[in-house]
Swiss-Prot record:
This is Bifunctional purine biosynthesis protein PurH. HAMAP family: PurH. Pathway: Purine metabolism; IMP biosynthesis via de novo pathway; 5-formamido-1-(5-phospho-D-ribosyl)imidazole-4-carboxamide from 5-amino-1-(5-phospho-D-ribosyl)imidazole-4-carboxamide (10-formyl THF route): step 1/1; Purine metabolism; IMP biosynthesis via de novo pathway; IMP from 5-formamido-1-(5-phospho-D-ribosyl)imidazole-4-carboxamide: step 1/1. Belongs to the PurH family. The keyword Hydrolase applies. It comes from Clostridium beijerinckii (strain ATCC 51743 / NCIMB 8052) (Clostridium acetobutylicum). The keyword Thylakoid does not apply. Pfam families: AICARFT_IMPCHas, MGS. The gene is purH. Transmembrane segments: none annotated. The IMP cyclohydrolase activity resides in the N-terminal region. Its EC number is 2.1.2.3, 3.5.4.10.
């Protein structure tokens, strides 16, 4: 009995050459719908699926391969005498190759289509064939990825068959794909349900690339892109430089998010996932120069994020020092020419502002899921005798936008749209306060990611010349800090929202 391949693909790249190869090895081709037509038009002798099933395609193509004569041929165990006798008694031909790729649900779910249109891209027959073939991988070669045509052809050419190891790997790839595919469909159908956190968490990501290493050189790593969301970090373009490292991905994410907190032109300079210079200005150049001048030491080897176009003048300043990555929504052509003189400088063009509404992190044996910290303040409540001026209030909100991105315990001191001092990652609140104030000469406001447990932060800030403070409030000793502020004649406002970052 001749071997037989069932081929039904949406993405037809490479399938003609693969089908021709199988025919050259005396394999019969069975196919469906558009794939049948495509192969036939290109001169191949192809058996249409309804010749096998003696049943026409129906329901606008929803039912094509869902038939016992197809699935028995896939699932029969070749060295099981009872199975093979059953096939023989019912004149069912075995299927030895299943080549299927799916309707493009991953792509279509992100397009501006009606709900019902997206539903039509949920593939049923394809996954059913793939799963059946993958279960019986000892006897059936299953291909769900066009990139695997080559290895299968090479093995058949060299050995006359596909190795057990390869068949097992191809089967594993099927179930890997199916879990992502089903997860994407589940998330799509449950997206508007009131239950924010379903009983089972289905995440659907596809590998963007392997990374040279992880956080450290002895750790392996890869980066995966969401199949459901076109966010900032899976749609950017690399205009210059090497591929991003693991640490680059994490740092760029924070630099881009921080810069996009602001309506005004903004720049965020960042090292080791921590802002070292943040400023707003009338344009990207002014914002960059302000951020740079605050700490020209720490910015060296850093990541720079902008929320506006980068011009030549700004580029000329940046190439004066060593930087790892520049991220911006747009670049002037002459700015790009300047930046490209640094061949290893990674220059990224971003097409999307931050979009994610959930944040996930793994712990040993579990995953934590929470809302992104996208809410800055609940309500501005002045709690001191003195009220902040309009200019101070602008700086207070500026400082709170920055402190969101600093590891807790975190303090930012600022003036005139410049983060002059940033202190973070400490186990008490007074140490980051002292760090920020030491660096932040001339600062007039102080922002804290969480409440003051004692009055010492307010005392230290007031003695250093701070005129206004912004913090969430909520300590049982809030009054102690309020009294200190009133004593020194400075203002303090509560926001109601804490911004811990771990």
């Amino acid at each position: 009995m001749k071997k037989r391949a069932l081929i039904s693909v949406f993405d037809k790249e490479g399938v003609l050459d693969f089908a021709k190869f199988l025919v050259s090895k005396d394999v019969e081709i069975v196919s469906t719908g558009g794939t049948y037509k495509y192969l036939k038009e290109n001169g191949l002798n192809v058996i249409e699926i309804n010749e096998v099933t003696d049943f026409p395609e129906m329901l606008d193509g929803r039912v094509k391969t869902l038939h016992p004569l197809v699935h028995a041929g896939i699932l029969a165990i070749r060295d099981n005498e009872e199975h093979m006798n059953t096939l023989k008694g019912r004149n069912i031909h075995t299927i030895d190759y299943v080549v299927v790729n799916l309707y493009p649900f991953f792509e279509k779910v992100k397009e501006d289509l009606e709900f019902e249109e997206k539903v039509e891209f949920i593939d049923i027959g394809g996954p059913t064939m793939l799963r059946a073939a993958a279960k019986n991988f000892q006897d059936v070669v299953v291909i769900s990825d066009k990139n695997d045509y080559k290895v299968v052809m090479e093995e058949i050419e060299a050995n006359g068959e596909t190795s057990y190891k390869t068949k097992k790997k191809l089967a594993g790839k099927v179930f890997n794909l199916m879990s992502a595919y089903d997860g994407a469909i589940s998330n799509f159908l449950l997206a508007d349900e009131e239950e924010e956190y379903p009983e089972y968490l289905s995440v659907s990501y596809k590998k963007m690339q392997s990374l040279r290493y992880g956080e450290n050189s002895h750790q392996t790593a890869a980066v995966y892109a969401s199949t459901m969301l076109d966010g900032a970090m899976n749609t950017f373009e690399t205009l210059n430089g090497k591929e991003l490292s693991y640490n680059n991905f994490k740092d760029v994410d924070i630099a881009w998010k921080c810069a996009n907190e602001f309506d005004e032109p903004a720049c965020c300079a960042l090292k080791h996932n921590t802002p070292c210079g943040v400023a707003i200005g009338k344009d990207s150049y002014e914002a960059y120069m302000k951020a740079y001048e605050v700490d020209p030491t720490s910015i060296f080897g850093g990541i720079i994020g902008f929320n506006r176009k980068v011009d030549k003048k700004t580029a000329e300043e940046m190439v004066k020092i060593f930087l790892e990555v520049i991220a911006a929504p747009e670049y002037d052509e002459d700015a790009l020419e300047v930046l490209k003189t640094k061949k290893n400088l990674r220059v990224l063009k971003f097409h999307n502002t931050p979009k994610a509404d959930k944040y996930m992190v793994t712990v040993d044996g579990a995953m934590l899921v929470q809302e992104e910290d996208n809410k800055l303040v609940e309500e501005i409540k002045v709690v001191t005798e003195k009220k902040p001026t309009d200019e101070e209030m602008k700086d207070l909100l500026f400082g709170m936008k920055v402190v969101k991105y600093v590891k807790s315990n975190a303090i930012v001191v600022a003036h005139n749209g410049i983060a002059l001092g940033i202190g973070g990652g400490q186990v008490n609140r007074i140490w980051p306060t002292e760090d920020a104030l030491k660096r932040g000469k001339g600062a007039t406001i102080l922002a804290s990611d969480a409440y003051f447990p004692f009055g010492d932060v307010a005392e230290t800030a007031a003695k250093a010349g701070i005129k206004a403070i912004i913090q969430p409030g909520g300590s049982i000793r809030d009054q102690e800090s309020i009294d200190v502020c009133n004593k020194y004649g400075i203002s303090m406002v509560f926001t109601g929202y804490r911004h811990f970052k771990h």
